[in-house]
Amino acid sequence: MMFTSESDLMRTIDWNEESNSVVLVDQTLLPQEYKVIECKTLSSLCEAIKSLRIRGAPALGAAGGFGIALAASLSGAKDLESMTRDLKVAAKALKSTRSTAVNLGWGVDRVLNAISDAFDVQGARDIALQEARDIAEEDIATNKLIGKYGTKFLKDGDSVLTHCNAGRLACVDWGTALGVVRSAIEEGKEIKVIACETRPLNQGSRITTWELMQDKIPVTLIADSMAGWAMHQGLVDSVLVGADRITQDVVFNKIGTYTHSILAKEHEIPFYVAAPISTFDFKGWEGSVKIEMRDPDELRFSGCQQLAPKDVEVYNPAFDATPMENVTAIITDKGVFYPPFLLDEVLV
């Protein structure tokens, strides 16, 4: 299915007023099928997060916010104290779905904190939904700012290598890393994207290439293992990725990002990270963050096809950690930060 304009694509995640439910693009079906699914219960939303129907740090922040709004809508509590208990249970369930992405918990906590201003149960429901909607709206504005600050790093005619998907489908709309590309193109620059497949779930080949092709942005798909050779051949002008969590010492992002950072450093190619301030974990460091481990069968199988012996031992972390010394700059909605990266400066 090819869409003819941006208006054909709904936001990655939104609220359906008529059914009081969360609606989202099921990214597990791409590129074969573009389908919007409805989450009418908290358990269905949690399943959507766990199974990566919705993924990407900023999108998960919105999912966390809408999740609390959904729980408030479904709660049968008669008083604020009972509702608060219900929402704390919902918050725990939402946060447990993905351990590494900081935005999910940030979105949950932001809506919970907003509800503290409520005077009654209906007021809490109204505040929760409005705060969740604010998170979604702010995400789009934030991504546009990231794009604005990042375009100076992309020259007319550049080829940009990216990993996983940090585009509109990783956010409510527009994108972080790919948002920088979109902003540069809006300025009239010709930019090409080299998308790494991003094994084992192939977010690069399934989602990034599909998304860019919808917007008619030139994209070339390569195997993950070819990135270094592409750099050696002079095909890559810069590497531009998103982030799932940024701590004092490292950038957590999709597995394979660390390898790209080493290859970029070896070939003297700039390595940029594009992420909102909400992705920063100001108190964390590499050793304090639990990296999510995925199902071993993601490596043993591709769909229904077996790729490896069923009983082979598998090590399948979802993320890796790129040290700050490998990062040229971090592009945020508050501006660009350069090494040495002092997170206290980000708070100013």
Curated annotation (Swiss-Prot):
Q: Which SUPFAM superfamilies match?
A: NagB/RpiA/CoA transferase-like
Q: Which reactions does this protein catalyse?
A: 5-(methylsulfanyl)-alpha-D-ribose 1-phosphate = 5-(methylsulfanyl)-D-ribulose 1-phosphate
Task: Tell me which species this is from.
Answer: Methanosarcina acetivorans (strain ATCC 35395 / DSM 2834 / JCM 12185 / C2A)
What does the function comment of this entry state?
Catalyzes the interconversion of methylthioribose-1-phosphate (MTR-1-P) into methylthioribulose-1-phosphate (MTRu-1-P).
GO biological process entries: L-methionine salvage from methylthioadenosine
Q: What is this protein called?
A: Putative methylthioribose-1-phosphate isomerase
- Per its record, what are the GO molecular function terms? S-methyl-5-thioribose-1-phosphate isomerase activity
What positions constitute the catalytic site?
Answer: 244 (proton donor)
**EC number from the UniProt entry:** 5.3.1.23
Q: Which residues bind substrate?
A: 55-57, 98, 203, 253-254
Keyword entries, A-Z: Amino-acid biosynthesis, Isomerase, Methionine biosynthesis
Q: Where is this site: Transition state stabilizer?
A: 164
Q: Name one Pfam family in it.
A: IF-2B
In this UniProt entry, which cysteines form S-S bonds? none
The entry sums up its family as follows:
Belongs to the eIF-2B alpha/beta/delta subunits family. MtnA subfamily.
HAMAP family, per the entry:
Salvage_MtnA (MF_01678)
